[in-house]
């Protein structure tokens, strides 16, 4: 998914908000 292409996508707030993409 697109959010997984973001730097550090699977850490911090981004991961909590988009956990389904990690």
UniProtKB/Swiss-Prot annotation:
Q: Which UniProt keywords apply?
A: Amidation, Disulfide bond, Ion channel impairing toxin, Neurotoxin, Secreted, Toxin, Voltage-gated sodium channel impairing toxin
Signal sequence extent:
none
Annotated tissue distribution: Expressed by the venom duct. Has not been isolated from the crude venom.
Q: Name one GO cellular component term.
A: extracellular region
Which of the residues bear the PTM Cysteine amide? 22
Which residue ranges traverse the bilayer?
none
Query: Looking at the keywords, is Transferase present?
Result: no
Q: What else is known?
A: Negative results: does not inhibit Nav1.7/SCN9A and Nav1.8/SCN10A.
Its biological function?
Mu-conotoxins block voltage-gated sodium channels (Nav). This synthetic toxin moderately blocks rNav1.1/SCN1A, rNav1.2/SCN2A, rNav1.3/SCN3A, rNav1.4/SCN4A, rNav1.5/SCN5A, and mNav1.6/SCN8A. This block is very slowly reversible. Causes seizures when injected intracranially into mice.
Family statement:
Belongs to the conotoxin M superfamily.
Domain remarks:
The cysteine framework is III (CC-C-C-CC).
Protein name per its UniProtKB record: Mu-conotoxin CnIIIA
Organism encoding this protein: Conus consors
